[in-house]
Amino acid sequence: MDPGECTCMSGGICICGDNCKCTTCNCKTCRKSCCPCCPPGCAKCAQGCICKGGSDKCSCCA
């Protein structure tokens, strides 16, 4: 499995580590994962963005 294409369940154990660049990884332990509310192509997506509640925006891709 490509470490940049992991698919973690929310709250599960993330196996991607700091190299996680997938858009479906919701693990809290994967600090550099993309959050599900991050739009495609967001350059800052892998910088620990956090989704703000039920909105479709996150802290780094407003």
UniProtKB/Swiss-Prot annotation:
Keywords in alphabetical order: Copper, Metal-binding, Metal-thiolate cluster, Zinc
Q: Which GO terms describe its molecular function?
A: metal ion binding
Gene Ontology CC: cytoplasm; nucleus
Entries under InterPro entries matching the protein: Metalthion_dom_sf (IPR017854), Metalthion_dom_sf_vert (IPR023587), Metalthion_vert (IPR000006), Metalthion_vert_metal_BS (IPR018064)
SUPFAM superfamilies in UniProt:
Metallothionein
Presence of the UniProt keyword NADP in the record: no
Residues annotated as binding a divalent metal cation 6 are: C38, C42, C45, C61
Binding of a divalent metal cation 1 occurs at C6, C8, C22, C25
GO-annotated biological processes? cellular response to cadmium ion; cellular response to copper ion; cellular response to zinc ion; detoxification of copper ion; intracellular zinc ion homeostasis
List of residues binding a divalent metal cation 7? C51, C58, C60, C61
Positions that bind a divalent metal cation 5: C35, C37, C38, C51
- PANTHER family in alphabetical order: METALLOTHIONEIN, METALLOTHIONEIN-4
Tell me, in a sentence or two, what this protein's role is.
Answer: Seems to bind zinc and copper. Could play a special role in regulating zinc metabolism during the differentiation of stratified epithelia.
Q: Which family does it belong to?
A: Belongs to the metallothionein superfamily. Type 1 family.
Task: Tell me what this protein is called.
Answer: Metallothionein-4
